[in-house]
Each structure stands twice: as C-alpha cells, then as structure tokens.
Amino acid sequence: MARLLLLFFFFLILLHYASCSRHEQEKDRIFHLPGEPNDVSFSHFSGYITVNESAGRALFYWLTESPPSENPESKPLVLWLNGGPGCSSVAYGAAEEIGPFRINPDGKTLYHNPYSWNKLANLLFLESPAGVGFSYSNTTSDLYTAGDQRTAEDAYVFLVKWFERFPQYKHREFYIAGESYAGHYVPQLSQIVYEKRNPAINFKGFIVGNAVIDDYHDYVGLFEYWWAHGLISDLTYHNLRITCEFGSSEHPSSKCTKAMEAADLEQGNIDPYSIYTVTCKKEAAALRSRFSRVRHPWMWRAYDPCTEKYSGMYFNSPEVQKAMHANITGLAYPWKGCSDIVGEKWADSPLSMLPIYKELIAAGLRIWVFSGDTDSVVPITGTRYSIRALKLQPLSKWYPWNDDGQVGGWSQVYKGLTLVTIHGAGHEVPLFRPRRAFLLFQSFLDNKPLPM
C-alpha cells in the first residue's frame, strides 16, 4: 500500500511538471506574425530563457518546427548560431538564410523560403551572447566583457533550461550548426555538451560554414585568397604575411593593422562576402568606417549590411516584437543585426579550435565543414589549411559533387570529418546558393556524402 501511494505521489509530481512545461511553451507560442503569408502550417515559438539570475542575463530564441506534412515529431532538433562576434541568428540565420520566412523589401511583409531547412529539421535560433539582438543583461558591464568562454557557458545553460521547457525534444537527435565566428561558438558549445553528457541531450554532431577555425591557418589562407584573386598587390601580400600571420586576429599588432588598412584600400568597393556580387554603396562605405575601431581587423566586416536593411525594419516593429514576445524589458537601444559594443569589446578568443576538433573527432561525433568559394572574409583556403593541420586520413578523393547536372561544389571525406565547398556561394552560403545549401544539409542529416 505504501509503495502504491509513493508511486501515485510520484505520478502527481510528473503530471504537475508536465503541465508547467506545457504552460511555459504555450506562453511562447507565436500565433501570427505581422505580414506573414496566409498558408503558414508549422508551429513556432519564441521567448526568453534566463541563463544567469544574479546578472539578469536572458537569451532570446526562436523555434520553427517542421510542417505537419514533414512529421515534425520524427525530425531532429538543430540549434543554429551566427557569429560576428555579436551578430544575431534571428537576423541572419532565420531571416535570410535557412529559416522559413524571408522579409520583403517593404520591411513589413514576409514570404516563404522554398529551401527552408525546417523542412528537414526543427530549427532553434539563438541570439547569443547577451546584448545581441533581443537578448539582454541587467548588468551593463556584461555587454563590454562578453567573450568565448561565457558565451559557451551561457549557451549550455540555455540548452538545459530550454529542454526543460520543451521536454518533447529530450532524447531527440540534436545537432549544432552555424557559420563565421560561430566557428568558435559551435565547437566550444559542442565540447561542453559532449563532456557534460546530459542524458536529455542526444547530441550527435555539428556542422559549420565559412568558419573561423585557427588564427594562423585562417590568416595564411585569407591573404593567399586575396592575392590569388587579384584583390591586393604583391607588396601588401608580403607585408600581411610578415606582420600578421603569427599574431592573434583578436589582438593584432599595429603593423598588422596598418597592412590590413592598405589591403582594404586596394580591394576597393567590393562585397567581401561575395566578391563577384554588386555592393550597396552607402552601407559599404559606413562599414568601411568601422575598420579603425575594431580590434580584430580581418573580422571587422562581421556580416554584410547590404542584406540586413529589411530585417532591421521588420524586427524593430512593435507589432512584430509583441507577436514574438520580444523586447519585454524595453531595451534602451533598437534591435540590430550586429551589436557594435559586443563585437568591438570581445574579451577572449582562443587562437585555435583545432584541439577541440581533435577531441570531438576522437569521440566519434559527426562533423562537417562547408565553405562558399566566393567569400573573401573567411575563405576556403584558410579552411583547407586548418583541416590539413588535423592530419586526418582521407576516405575519398577530392571530387565535384552534383546539383542537377551542374557542379554544386567539391568535397572530400576524411576519417572523422567531411569537407564540402559550395560553388558560387559567398559567406552566407544559404543566402547565395539556397538549393545547394539545402542539399548539403540533407546529406549531413542523412550522414551520406554529396552525390557525384
């Protein structure tokens, strides 16, 4: 009898817990976004998770589930992180790359993304760290002291609490994805998730694109790409190599900064994120003026401002913020795609992610690295040098992969890692080549090489 009472009491506790979780979920449900198409079928949620009570740090998320026709209960969960550092996953990942909606030029209405990755997985976008997008801290100094370590630690706390709010995703296949400076965020968070071994988080691996991996090899590849594509002179190439290559991208020397400035002048008014794409002149000029203020000059361009005008209009709308349960504290500044303060004051940035790659490769996790081949900010050359430094055993030859009879890019499979390039894509691969990015993601989830 006592045992039955104990079991009944335990059942009541579980029932209460499930009811609380469901209530928290429903508070975050998005019923309608201003300007959305009439035929939206999938469920989506957004809101805040507090990651540090004493400092008042809370991170904003947006979950877009797979449509009912795709059986979302059977689909994995994928966390997407954008880099910068200091740039929003809502602005870039969700609104112009892999999310279900794109924003029209009027900044008020939305249209469907035919190659949205939520057709293949449930997508969780996180604005991180605090101070980015709608994520906030009640401790002002947090915005000036953000760095790699705290970003990873806060993201892990977010995940643990988010899985409590959405318990139906516990034990579901879980992956982490991202691009650019998320080449730090993704492996660092992956390392914590792997080492913590939380039974609720069924972590399987990660995928990163045009990723910052290793300062030395990234520098070598960056300067080589500029020179080989005729963007800089022989003299500037020489000066960059002797002044920058053995330094930190986060804390460059004055000589390195001077060489970077010379390279910038020689490159002229191009779009560095996609060197064959026409620029938007006003924003490019404003971006160039930021160069002298940042401490990591080769990453000074964080993300292309030419593509973020529409998102700035949309996500600053009070009606949109209300629908998304965003800006609930009344931030003293407008929502922006990238936070200048967070990016410029970045505190800690390890020189290399290669030791983490080695640890997670040895652990047997699925790891894919992809690169758009027209990006001159974090180009394919640096990525290839970094991967070569891992000294992995090749399992396939370097081969062209097929996209409807055309070369979609090139790939090579190694023991523990797959490298893929996307032909004709810039820094934000899904923005420039959405179909090819979709095929890439599908192959990653299926754990199959891209087709020859």
From Swiss-Prot:
It is found in: Secreted. GO terms for biological process: proteolysis. Residues 1-20 form the signal peptide. Its EC number is 3.4.16.-. The keyword Cytoplasm does not apply. It comes from the Eukaryota. The active site is at residues 180, 375, 427. Disulfide bonds join 87-338, 244-256, 280-306. Keywords: Carboxypeptidase, Disulfide bond, Glycoprotein, Hydrolase, Protease, Secreted, Signal. InterPro entries: AB_hydrolase_fold, Peptidase_S10, Ser_caboxypep_his_AS, Ser_caboxypep_ser_AS. Probable carboxypeptidase. This is Serine carboxypeptidase-like 26. It comes from Arabidopsis thaliana (Mouse-ear cress). The lineage of its organism: Eukaryota, Viridiplantae, Streptophyta, Embryophyta, Tracheophyta.
